[in-house]
Amino acid sequence: MKRPYSFLILCLVMVSTACAQDKIIFEEDFNSDTLNMEVWNYEEGDGCPNLCGWGNNEKQIYNRDYVALEDGKLVITAEKKADTYYSGKINSKDKVEFTYGVIEVKAKLATGKGLWPAIWMLGADISEVGWPASGEIDILEYIGREPGIVFTSLHTPASHGNTINTKKTKIADIEEGYHTYKAVWTPEYIEFFVDGKQLYRFTPENYNEEEYPFKKDFYFLINMAVGGNLGGAEIDESALPDKFYVDHIKVTELPEDY
């Protein structure tokens, strides 16, 4: 596990019993004036030349100006200027990477048609093995063209990267306010929750790199795409600018009885 930034130093300023209970691997509350560059990287551009449209025919250009911290929240804005769509994307590659844990993210969705906010993870070895060999864990995906639906998915070499290990769940008030998205990532399964309600558990038939490439370090990505294969061709420009808010991220070690 790579922890160049010592998040566990939090335990030094807490009482020992609280540390033992929480077993925090990583915690980010965005309570600062600027993005913590010891934790995060900006991703910018349109993915070209190697991954134009970010591999999904997305319309946006990522620019760090569309990532902000406001009132203790991470805010990613999607906007159209002239003929160009802009949005923001950050990742924790080479800075915060870990294997297994209970991941909780509190977020408020952008809901315009054509928008695609997401909180997800990629295998830290993606530069060496490529995708989908790296594996992908989609903790939250939402698309404005399917209101009231949350997507939780996994991508593996066995699925050839296709979204077959997935669950679409109808949640009546998902567009209203903040909700807590959780993934329990273990050596045997990955399970997804929203506001404490279990949505989907993925358990492979075989625990090999083809079917379960999830026994290694992964890193976070947070972004909002515009259009694309999942976001859809129709974009409601009257809904822009629209904002995707993330209140906090917390990762704790698996409980002994997971």
Where do the model's predicted regions map?
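GH16 jelly-roll
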Residues: 21-258
